[in-house]
């Protein structure tokens, strides 16, 4: 069945059916294959795309820019200090201005309501590159990566655990995506870091139709047993005070992904995933500062260096797939 997603916004996975999500994943796989084999056809020739970044980025910005260039589009980058958005001009007005100049707009920033306003008033496709509540482009990359490493399983047959801060945009988005695609997800976190009950209830309602299983637990062994994938993210999100680390570490240490936890899955083929950047040693300024202040973190914070560098880690396949899935979103909503 062909899907027409042309002119649709991509703001959160709650807005899409399982079949539409699967269509975008299949398109991403096709575009990846075409790029690798040298027969990619540009379907965004003559299109102009604006990238609004109110938060810093490596993977998301690079993926959008390279995807656009591969497909023949032109890009304007508007960084945190490069525009009047929110300072002298409202997002509603910005949307109506940029929508007359550009064919598509990406937004990465703060509240979900901001990108929803942009999407409501731009009149062109708007893509969510990350908000405080959701990170939907990352989830498509994650699910494409899972498909590639699931040893023949369909997504609906996959079991995975997300460990750590399950109330953040990654916990929210993985739960929504898993519910939509009929997956078995375990959100393994201290109770204070569980997702909002309203969103959990919404996802469980979706799960009744798709066959998904959603478990929210503090019990690490219950959460990881039998998993195909273990997933984590940083314990302190962008924009949070550095002082937040102290209160998090004692709560979060039992949820650090290490080799013992991989073994606890009982699956010798288990894979490790992380949306990156990851604190897994002292090779960054933040990592070094944390290790000096908290010696127990010298081998890593949310994940140990041993895990990231092990055969179980697929984090760089996952990072590359940001490019192919973001390209699929742009082609599906804007392509000719």
From Swiss-Prot:
S-S bridge residues: none
Residue numbers binding carbamoyl phosphate: 57-60, 84, 108, 135-138, 275-276, 322
InterPro entries registered for this protein in UniProt: Asp/Orn_carbamoyltranf_P-bd, Asp/Orn_carbamoylTrfase, Asp/Orn_carbamoylTrfase_sf, Asp_carbamoyltransf_Asp/Orn-bd, Orn/put_carbamltrans, OTCase_ArgI
SUPFAM superfamilies xref list: Aspartate/ornithine carbamoyltransferase (SSF53671)
Membrane-crossing segments per the record: none
EC number of this enzyme: 2.1.3.3
One Pfam family in the UniProt entry: OTCace_N
Class in the EC hierarchy, top level: transferase
GO biological process, one term: arginine biosynthetic process via ornithine
Keywords: Arginine metabolism, Cytoplasm, Transferase
Pathway(s) per entry: Amino-acid degradation; L-arginine degradation via ADI pathway; carbamoyl phosphate from L-arginine: step 2/2
Highest taxon in the source lineage: Bacteria
Stated family: Belongs to the aspartate/ornithine carbamoyltransferase superfamily. OTCase family.
Protein task: Reversibly catalyzes the transfer of the carbamoyl group from carbamoyl phosphate (CP) to the N(epsilon) atom of ornithine (ORN) to produce L-citrulline.
Name of the protein described by the UniProt record: Ornithine carbamoyltransferase, catabolic
Organism: Photobacterium profundum (strain SS9)
């Amino acid at each position: 069945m062909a899907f027409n997603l042309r002119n649709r916004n991509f703001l959160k996975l709650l807005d899409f059916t399982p079949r539409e999500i699967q269509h975008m994943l299949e398109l991403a796989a096709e575009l990846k294959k075409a790029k690798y084999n040298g027969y990619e056809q540009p379907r965004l020739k003559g299109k102009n795309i604006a990238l609004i970044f109110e938060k810093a980025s490596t993977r998301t910005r690079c993926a959008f820019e390279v995807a656009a260039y591969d497909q023949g589009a032109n890009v304007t980058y508007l960084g945190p200090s490069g525009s009047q958005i929110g300072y002298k001009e409202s997002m509603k007005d910005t949307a109506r201005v940029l929508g007359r100049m550009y064919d598509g707009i990406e937004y990465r920033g703060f509240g979900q309501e901001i990108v929803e306003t942009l999407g409501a008033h731009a009149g062109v496709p708007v893509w969510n590159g990350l908000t405080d509540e959701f990170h939907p482009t990352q989830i498509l990359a994650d699910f494409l990566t899972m498909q590639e490493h699931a040893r023949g399983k369909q997504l609906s047959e996959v079991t995975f655990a997300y460990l750590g801060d399950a109330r953040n945009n990654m916990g929210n988005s993985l739960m929504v995506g898993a519910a939509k695609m009929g997956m078995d997800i375990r959100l393994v976190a201290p109770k204070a870091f569980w997702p909002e009950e309203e969103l959990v209830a919404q996802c469980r309602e979706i799960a009744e139709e798709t066959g998904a299983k959603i478990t929210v637990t503090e019990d690490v062994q219950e959460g990881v047993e039998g998993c195909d994938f273990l997933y984590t993210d940083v314990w302190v999100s962008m924009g949070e005070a550095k002082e937040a680390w102290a209160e998090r570490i004692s709560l979060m240490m039992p949820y650090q992904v290490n080799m013992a936890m991989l073994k606890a899955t009982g699956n010798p083929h288990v894979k490790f995933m992380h949306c990156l950047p990851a604190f897994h040693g002292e090779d960054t300024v933040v990592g070094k500062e944390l290790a000096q202040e908290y010696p127990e973190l010298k081998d890593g914070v949310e994940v140990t260096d041993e895990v990231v560098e092990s055969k179980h880690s697929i984090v760089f396949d996952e990072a590359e797939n940001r490019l192919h899935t973001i390209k699929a979103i742009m082609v599906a909503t804007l392509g000719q």
